[in-house]
Amino acid sequence: MDVSLAGKVAIVTGAGPNIGSGIALALAKYGATVACNDIDADAAKTAVKRIERNGGTAIAIPGDVTDEEQVKGYLQEVVERFGRVDILVNNAALLGGKGVLDESADFFRRAVEVAALGNFLNTKHIGRYMAEHGIRGSIVAISSSNGWSGSAGVIAYAFHKGGVNNFVRAAAMDLAPYGIRVNSFTPTAPTPDNPELIAERGAGGVLERPQAFRHGIGGATGTESWRRPARWTGERMPLVPMGTTGTPTDIGHCVAWLCSDYSRLITGCDFVVDGGARAKNFAYAPAAVADLAGPAPLVPLDVTGELDRELSM
Ligand SMILES: NC(=O)c1ccc[n+]([C@@H]2O[C@H](COP(=O)([O-])OP(=O)(O)OC[C@H]3O[C@@H](n4cnc5c(N)ncnc54)[C@H](O)[C@@H]3O)[C@@H](O)[C@H]2O)c1
């Protein structure tokens, strides 16, 4: 009883080197042919190369998810090339930003636009293609823990991820009559595990941001006397019951299963792979990581990356 996506064709939007690339790789490793979109053509091509060096089949379909003609264009390209589309992962998003006192209208507008039109236009045109061709497809929107609860310093992100969550439930109702499923997956600050990303940016996987871009949530970015801190900066208690919120590989396993026929009746739902982080009551502080048994070993997907890393050690 193996989960298999053999014969299925997937489109993953925003297939940048972290979560998008991880999901695209997972879909390929489970047998799907994958079309990797990104507004950054190099990011899309890099995701394709990662899939190919792991033995999968992929093409790059660069484009802006907010541009309807471009969405229709890359959908057509995928259909001409592979004859069908069974899976859509709406992953593209603008991360970061600032708090409500400091965010600019331009950033807020664009961040909301990428999430809103990205999810809408891709779900509309690819869902319509699936419906017209009798394909009982699976659509997965990538949300965030910030879509379910509040953090300081990410007001645009909180707004659009909250929107994504109910978009999924409504789109699930629209597409249920066609046998097409719509669900969300909620990442919770996974630890990057793409070897190329780590080689380029270090273990955290993020480029060091200038002070001015660090959230604007309190005294850190402003010297005004009225500013108050919004984030605890002292020693941190353990936050995650199982000690880790996992990696993009963990996300990929879950999304691949969600796109398989095993989940044929799952629609309008949200999934987390977060070591219990979201289930935790606010007043409960988990044990220290060193005292935990830890999760079962990760089943790796980037096999050549693992081998390369072992060889270079
Ligand atoms: N990294 C995290 O800790 C985290 C946590 C929770 C949720 N998420 C979500 O996971 C997803 C991926 O996050 P990530 O960490 O890999 O971020 P990322 O910034 O590395 O990837 C997002 C990609 O989307 C692309 N993109 C942006 N605008 C686009 C557009 N208009 N058209 C096409 N592509 C566009 C970017 O170029 C980028 O490659 C996002 O939806 C994000 O909100 C991430």
Per-range role (PLM):
Residues 3-34:
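Canonical Rossmann dinucleotide-binding motif of NAD(H)/NADP(H)-dependent dehydrogenases/reductases
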Residues 4, 82, 120, 242-273, ...:
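C-terminal substrate-recognition "lid" of short-chain dehydrogenase/reductases
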Residues 89, 176, 181, 266-268:
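Short, small/polar-rich loop/turn modules that mediate ligand/substrate recognition or access, typified
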Residues 99-112, 236:
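Substrate-binding pocket helix/loop in short-chain dehydrogenase/reductase
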Residues 123, 160, 168:
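Active-site helix of classical SDR
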Residues 128, 173-177, 264:
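Alpha-helical segment proximal to the catalytic Tyr-Lys
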Residues 144:
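Residue(s) in the substrate-gating loop at a strand-loop-helix junction
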